Regions:
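Alpha-helical cap/lid subdomain in secreted, periplasmic
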Residues: 18-34, 38, 43, 47-185
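Catalytic nucleophile-elbow at a beta strand-turn-alpha helix junction centered on a G-D-S/GDSL motif
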Residues: 1-15, 40-44
C-alpha cells in the first residue's frame, strides 16, 4: 500500500511520520509499503493543493493520505475562505484520483493556539479545516487540543514538548494519538 504524508515542516521532520511508518509496517506485516514524504516547510493548504499532483499523486495510487496545514495556514495569514478552499482542493483532488483513498486530517499545535485552547476556544483555522473534514466525512486528529490539555494537566510543559517543532518526546505524543485513531480505523 502507498501511504503519503502532505504537510509542512512538522511533517518533514524526522519524528511522528517515521513512527507512523514503523507502526503501519507492524500493524500490516504482509503489506509491502511505499511511503511518500511530502512535507515542505512553511507550506499550508493552498501550496499543498498545487503540489499534490507532483509531490504525492505522481508516486502511484495512494491508499492512505495524512494531511496537515493548520499551523502554516495560520502563520501565513491565509483567510478563512483560502483555508477552506486550499484544504478542499487537496481532499477533492485526492479523492478524484482514488475514490477509495483514506484521508486523515491532522491539526498540530503552535504557540498562538495555546491561549485560545486554554480558554476552551478552537483556533479558527482548525474550525475551517474541520468544515472540510466533516463535509467529506474524514477522520481528523486534533493534536493541538490534545497537547494543550496535557500541558494544562501538568503532564509536560511546552518546552519539554519541544515547541512548534517538537522534540522526539513531542513527536512520540503525536504518533501515539494518531495511532489511537488508526486503531479505530483498522
Amino acid at each position: 500500500g502507498t501511504v503519503a504524508f502532505l504537510g509542512g515542516s512538522i511533517t518533514e521532520m524526522k519524528g511522528w511520520r517515521d513512527m507512523i511508518c514503523e507502526d503501519l509496517k507492524q500493524r500490516f506485516p504482509y503489506t509491502k509499503f511505499t511511503f511518500v514524504a511530502a512535507g515542505i516547510p512553511s507550506t499550508g493548504s493552498t501550496p499543498g493543493a498545487f503540489r499534490l499532483t507532483d509531490d504525492v499523486l505522481s508516486k502511484g495510487k495512494v491508499d492512505l493520505l495524512f494531511v496537515e496545514a493548520a499551523v502554516n495556514d495560520d502563520t501565513n495569514g491565509f483567510s478563512a475562505i483560502e483555508q477552506i478552499r486550499g484544504m478542499e482542493g487537496i481532499v477533492r483532488h485526492a479523492l478524484v484520483s482514488n475514490p477509495s483513498m483514506d484521508i486523515m486530517m491532522l491539526h498540530f499545535i503552535y504557540d498562538p493556539f495555546i491561549p485560545k485552547l486554554d480558554k476552551g476556544q478552537m483556533p479558527d483555522v482548525i474550525l475551517n479545516h474541520e468544515r472540510v473534514a466533516n463535509h467529506y466525512l474524514l477522520p481528523s486528529v486534533n493534536l493541538a487540543s490534545e497537547i494543550a490539555a496535557r500541558m494544562r494537566s501538568g503532564e509536560f510543559t511546552w518546552e519539554q514538548f519541544g515547541g512548534t517543532h517538537p522534540n522526539l518526546l513531542g513527536h512520540a505524543y503525536y504518533a501515539a494519538t494518531i495511532n489511537k485513531v488508526l486503531d479505530e480505523m483498522y
